[in-house]
């Protein structure tokens, strides 16, 4: 039986009694955001709205975006990326589990020097896909042109934010390229790999 979204106690400043709130609402108050699903318009709008709201609330405190996503739609992903560049606070990106396709694009969009992957995380990049086979000929041509523009946009961003030459990024985007956390660091997609806490006491 599904338990739904867990709830945790939260006491607002000046209040004596705590109230039970959705765990994500509680974490949002600490400026911690989560992309834990496929990228679509709904989650994109939620994250964009949260980033804008938290910037209005305090434009000096950093934001933290945790990513575990198989990818998703290109335009909603670009909306998240552009908002990350637009807001005043630095946006840390943290890859846990998988950041694939648009997930890796959002990961690379974090503030340079503040992009991190957990030790066993996986990252995958590739070119944007399409539903060509469903489109009539005229729409097919228009969609192919638009897809080419989107590919150029994504490639340019990866080049700019990883420091890799155009030919390397272009070659990688020809197919699905999976990377470990350390490989993603070497590739310039993340800056740091988290160190496992062994639990040893000093």
Curated annotation (Swiss-Prot):
Recorded hits in PANTHER family, A to Z, give: ATP-DEPENDENT CLP PROTEASE PROTEOLYTIC SUBUNIT (PTHR10381), CHLOROPLASTIC ATP-DEPENDENT CLP PROTEASE PROTEOLYTIC SUBUNIT 1 (PTHR10381:SF15)
Q: Which family does it belong to?
A: Belongs to the peptidase S14 family.
Q: How does it assemble?
A: Component of the chloroplastic Clp protease core complex.
The protein's annotated catalytic reaction(s) are:
Hydrolysis of proteins to small peptides in the presence of ATP and magnesium. alpha-casein is the usual test substrate. In the absence of ATP, only oligopeptides shorter than five residues are hydrolyzed (such as succinyl-Leu-Tyr-|-NHMec, and Leu-Tyr-Leu-|-Tyr-Trp, in which cleavage of the -Tyr-|-Leu- and -Tyr-|-Trp bonds also occurs)
Name of the molecule in the record: ATP-dependent Clp protease proteolytic subunit
Q: Where are the coiled-coil regions? A: none
Instruction: Report the EC code(s) recorded for this entry.
Output: 3.4.21.92
Q: Where in the cell is it found?
A: Plastid, Chloroplast stroma
Give this protein's Gene Ontology molecular function annotations. ATP-dependent peptidase activity; ATPase binding; serine-type endopeptidase activity
> Per the record, GO CC terms?
chloroplast stroma; endopeptidase Clp complex
State the species of origin: Calycanthus floridus var. glaucus (Eastern sweetshrub)
The protein's matches in SUPFAM superfamilies, at most eight in alphabetical order, are given as:
ClpP/crotonase
Q: Briefly state the protein's biological role.
A: Cleaves peptides in various proteins in a process that requires ATP hydrolysis. Has a chymotrypsin-like activity. Plays a major role in the degradation of misfolded proteins.
Q: Does the keyword Signal apply?
A: no
